[in-house]
Design a protein with these regions (language model features):
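A short-motif feature that recognizes glycine-rich, charge-decorated loops
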Residues: 29, 47, 58-61, 156-159
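Disordered, low-complexity tails and leader-like regions
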Residues: 24-33, 39-43, 110-118, 122-126, ...
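Short, amphipathic alpha-helical interface elements at domain boundaries
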Residues: 1-45, 51-52
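Long, low-complexity, charge-rich intrinsically disordered regions
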Residues: 117-160
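Accessory beta->alpha helical hairpin/"wing" motif in late/C-terminal subdomains of nucleic-acid enzymes
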Residues: 51-118
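Generic detector of well-ordered alpha-helical segments enriched in charged/polar residues
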Residues: 12, 38-41, 64, 68, ...
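Ser/Thr-centered flexible coil motifs
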Residues: 2-6, 11, 57-60, 136-145
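Generic structural signal for short, solvent-exposed loop/turn connectors between secondary structure elements
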Residues: 1, 28-38, 51-56, 76-84, ...
Length: 160
């Protein structure tokens, strides 16, 4: 689901923790602060995330919980603006910054994320596919265990 930066700030404010790893969320006001808050709340009501100014819907719980899981994750990977948090339950939260300070948030199986990354960025695949390499490519669980056991955050991509 797509959210504006102000809507992401709202979700950040109602979940545990402070910062969202790798994403500098800030409530930037163009008009008065009060007008921006009302505009954000009305946008969330239109999307079905809020029932009223103080009541979160079941549909609103899912993105709030996804952001909370992203913040609680110990393992994050950033690949060319894709912000990925690896969760314990073989899932991943992917936050994609879009144009006009909007974000798309997805909850996917980790294997699906890895498959999509290899498909989108063929540079991550190296060499020819021999039988030995094919066996390594098929053993995704081993790769995921290595990433999970990694104590540090991983960043892959070109940075300027």
């Amino acid at each position: 689901m797509k959210f504006t930066e102000h809507e992401m700030v709202f979700f950040n404010s109602i979940t545990k923790g402070n910062d969202v790893f790798g994403i500098p969320l800030k409530f930037r006001t163009q008009k008065s602060h009060e007008e921006e808050v009302k505009k954000t709340i009305n946008g969330l009501i239109e999307k079905g995330v809020l029932a009223s100014e103080t009541e979160l819907t079941k549909m609103g719980f899912l993105p709030a919980r996804a952001l909370e899981c992203y913040k609680e994750s110990r393992n994050h990977v950033i690949i060319n603006y894709l912000h990925i948090a690896l969760l314990e339950q073989r899932e991943a939260i992917v936050i994609i910054p879009l144009k006009n300070r909007e974000y798309e948030m997805l909850r996917l199986p980790r294997v699906a994320v890895l498959y999509l990354l290899l498909k989108i960025y063929p540079v991550l695949q190296t060499g020819t596919v021999s039988e030995k390499e094919l066996l390594q490519l098929q053993d995704i669980d081993s790769f995921l265990r290595e990433v999970k056991d990694c104590k540090e955050n991983i960043m892959i991509g070109e940075f300027q």
